[in-house]
Amino acid sequence: MEEARAYEELRVGFTAAVSHELRTPLARVLALLETAALPGADTAVLLDQAREQVEEMARLIDDILFLSQLESGREVAALGTTRALPVLEEIAGRLADSAERADVRIVVDAEPDVELPLRRRMLAIVAENLAENSIRYAGPGATLTLTARPSELVAADDGRGLEEDELPRLFERFYRSDRARASRGTGLGLAIVKHVVASAGGQVEASGGPGRGVRITCTFPAP
């Protein structure tokens, strides 16, 4: 009975959080469309901004569905192993433009033969979410290093860092630090990382502090 009650409270809380997260970009879309209908409005610019908000909602919905699949066990994270270096290099290349705009440098550190116990797609999802988090929040001039070692994947930046009491909350769904609230992002990236790693039998931990950057370590069982 207690377990059922706890599950229901979690479900209700998650539904409320999803509703809140969708309401904000939806309100922006409606405001932009109303403004676009006014005489003399720059319709092209306003419609482009509205499109960006719709794309943000689509990303949020995709993340919610993926997280739901992970939690229900319908999406399998661990199925064999994947060489880490090609995946990390691919992610670094894919995010090069956004990293350049944020003035964040990405470095990949992995030996060619290092493998991690995740399907390729899952390793890419983990690495991309870790990298995107640093790109958004580390601050200009920071360096993000993606490191793969046997049974370990680390994303460490030397950016602004966070208060130590915020670090354990990074993996909560929809959690954003005070500084991150104005930044774009679904608020689910690190929650997805945690669930993917956990479904492969691993653990995730964040460390760091103000002015010391953030280090996120994903540790997997030894083969």
Predicted feature locations:
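Conserved catalytic submotifs in the C-terminal HATPase_c
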Residues: 78-80, 100, 105-115
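Short alpha-helical segment of the dimerization/phosphotransfer core of two-component systems
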Residues: 52-57
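Short conserved segment of the HATPase_c
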Residues: 162-174
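Short beta-strand/loop element within the Bergerat-fold HATPase_c
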Residues: 141-152
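Conserved glycine-rich
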Residues: 140, 201-202
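Conserved micro-motifs of the catalytic ATP-binding
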Residues: 72-77, 115-121
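Short helix-loop "hinge" at the ATP-lid/N-box region of the Bergerat-fold HATPase_c
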Residues: 134-135
